């Protein structure tokens, strides 16, 4: 495998695949990692489009629509990217490929065989997979009826006995839940979990939040047994910070500025109308 080469004396953190692994790989770097996979002749890796950084000369690329993605056409109609990229080593010698997530992420290797052949993850978490892995987007975890904001939670399932790689923002914590153990997580920080875990989501907000501010967390209540992966910096949270930094000072300092102005004028209107009515009387 090609060794990482830098012009500085600081070598990146390297996670080496276990010696018993069928396909050798390395995870390079710290906060924005690169996955480097060694491919034997005719060996293939399936990756999300737009994740390739570099390859050896023997690697051939092809855009494919996974046949198991039954809802792909419907997602494409609403602007979703449903095309994956297949990378095949067409040479007679070993080759390599470097993949990375489109945001600041750490990369987690997931051996599906150790998870009972199935894991559920956020739709943007999947990076690539090797061997026997099927990626579907038919899972749609919603909150109980009447709870607002539950769409889009853990809508992707990875099934098979192969090796998958998922990306998570910031630092990653793994929690092993015992039978009946409960864990409450911000839904945006939930990356992936075992399919054996039962959970529901709640929207913990109040009518005062749009006016006075505060967190309105969409929380996931998880009940074991199973394994949970939690990220410290979801891309949604990072994008909100960036958006606030590039907006005008009034909106940046108080995102609910326009709501408060609207309420002020509404109350002023009520006071004026009331004074006119009292004057007529």
Indicate residue ranges for each PLM-predicted region:
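Composition-driven recognition of glycine/serine/threonine/acidic- and proline-rich low-complexity segments
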Residues: 2-281
């Amino acid at each position: 495998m090609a060794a990482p080469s830098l012009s500085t004396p600081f070598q990146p953190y390297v996670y080496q695949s276990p010696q018993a692994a069928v396909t050798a790989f390395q995870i390079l770097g710290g906060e924005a990692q690169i996955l480097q996979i060694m491919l034997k002749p005719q060996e293939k890796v399936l990756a999300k489009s737009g994740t390739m950084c570099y390859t050896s000369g023997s690697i051939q690329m092809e855009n494919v629509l996974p046949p198991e993605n039954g809802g792909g056409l419907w997602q494409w109609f609403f602007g979703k990217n449903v095309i994956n990229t297949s990378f095949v080593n067409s040479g007679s010698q070993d080759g390599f490929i470097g993949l990375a997530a489109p945001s600041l992420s750490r990369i987690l290797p997931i051996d599906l065989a150790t998870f009972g052949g199935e894991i559920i993850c956020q739709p943007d978490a999947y990076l690539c997979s090797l061997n026997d892995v099927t990626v579907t987007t038919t899972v749609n975890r919603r909150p109980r009826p009447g709870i607002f904001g539950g769409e889009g939670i853990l809508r992707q399932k990875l099934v098979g006995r192969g090796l998958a790689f998922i990306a998570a923002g910031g630092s990653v914590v793994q929690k092993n839940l015992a039978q009946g153990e409960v864990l409450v997580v911000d839904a945006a920080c939930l990356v992936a979990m075992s399919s054996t875990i039962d959970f529901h989501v709640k929207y913990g907000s109040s009518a005062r939040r749009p006016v006075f501010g505060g967190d309105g967390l969409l929380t996931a209540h998880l009940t074991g047994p199973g394994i949970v992966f939690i990220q410290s910096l979801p891309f949604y949270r990072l994008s909100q910070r960036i958006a606030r930094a590039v907006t005008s000072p009034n909106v940046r300092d108080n995102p609910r500025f326009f709501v408060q102005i609207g309420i002020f004028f509404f109350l002023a209107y009520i006071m004026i109308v009331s004074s006119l009515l009292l004057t007529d009387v």
